[in-house]
């Protein structure tokens, strides 16, 4: 299945989190924290401005980003893989 975001939406695949602590302890269950880093796998056409023009997004496919997983993030499963759909405004930084 293929998925294409609309407007200012971005689709991310969450980066896997280390399952060991810095001291070498294996973390399980509630001790693990979900990563707020992800790889951009698709971007929408851009943000629609009040004057009717479209502003292109700052992120592009392949970018590694840090995001804010707030109320606006939508988690879906596509072909068995978990993806996140969020607005570009929820992306805090591009990791270079």
From Swiss-Prot:
What the protein does comes down to: Together with the chaperonin GroEL, plays an essential role in assisting protein folding. The GroEL-GroES system forms a nano-cage that allows encapsulation of the non-native substrate proteins and provides a physical environment optimized to promote and accelerate protein folding. GroES binds to the apical surface of the GroEL ring, thereby capping the opening of the GroEL channel.
Regarding protein family, the annotation reads: Belongs to the GroES chaperonin family.
Kindly report the protein's main subcellular placement as a broad class. cytoplasm
Naming one, the record's GO cellular component terms include:
cytoplasm
Please give the biological process terms from Gene Ontology that the record holds: chaperone cofactor-dependent protein refolding
Q: Under the GO molecular function aspect, what terms does this record hold?
A: ATP binding; metal ion binding; protein folding chaperone; protein-folding chaperone binding; unfolded protein binding
Q: Where in the cell is it found?
A: Cytoplasm
Would you say which domain of life the source belongs to?
A: Bacteria
Record text on subunit structure and interactions: Heptamer of 7 subunits arranged in a ring. Interacts with the chaperonin GroEL.
Against NCBIfam families, the record matches this protein to: PRK00364.1-1
Tell me which UniProt keywords the record has, alphabetically: Chaperone, Cytoplasm, Stress response
- What is the protein name stated in its UniProt record? Co-chaperonin GroES
Please name the CDD domains in this protein's record.
cpn10
| UniProt cross-references to Gene3D superfamilies, sorted A to Z | GroES chaperonin (2.30.33.40)
Annotated Pfam families: Cpn10
